[in-house]
Amino acid sequence: MIRTKHLISIMLVLTLLFSSSALAAKPKATHTPPPAEITKEIVEPPEEIQHLLEIVYNEWQTVNGKDQGKKNKYTAWYNDYPWGKNKWCAGFVTWCMLEAGIPQAYEKDVMALEEGVAPEKFYHVTSSKPTTMVPGYLHMHRTSEIPQKGFIVQYGQKNNRYTHVGFVYDVVPNADGTYRLSCIEGAVLNTVRM
């Protein structure tokens, strides 16, 4: 009896293994392109990003430390409601990207793209807050621990919560392999700061 059950079990397994559905042609795997190579050398940004940095710098100079309030030109692209005090850093980043003409899409549209793929050389995740901006960049595989001028810097907490974003304006490598960054950020003490 035990031998018969063993034989039936083996036959059942073999039948399943060699059934037509098991032998059906499987779809071919698609080629995954290698991630963009990120250099460890500090390089000058491309013309489009240099233009973006000029806009960012001009905003810093124009604002000159003045309080921008809870509703300002950096938030108007999203809505006309007052934002929380010091809560418009991602709005500032997106406003600058819009001014520079950088192509972009909202996070839900970016997340609908194939992972690791962005439709343009330069592409921004339109967002009014860091918590939706950063996941879109992660989805496009556009993150790095090697800073470059024009990159978006994101700050977070140990609980993996993204709390603030800004622009890397300048990078100076230190002898110990770390970097000194100069950043321009919106919503720092309710103004634009470097």
Positions of PLM-derived features:
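Bacterial N-terminal signal peptides that target proteins for export
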Residues: 1-8
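Sec-dependent signal peptide cleavage junction
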Residues: 18-34
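N-terminal capping segments
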Residues: 29-105
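N-terminal compositionally biased, intrinsically disordered segments and leader/signal-like regions
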Residues: 5, 16, 31, 40, ...
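Bacterial N-terminal signal peptides
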Residues: 10-19
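...with weaker cross-activation on analogous glycine-rich loops/strands in unrelated enzymes
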Residues: 103-193
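N-terminal cationic leader/targeting segments used for protein routing and processing
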Residues: 6, 27-29, 191
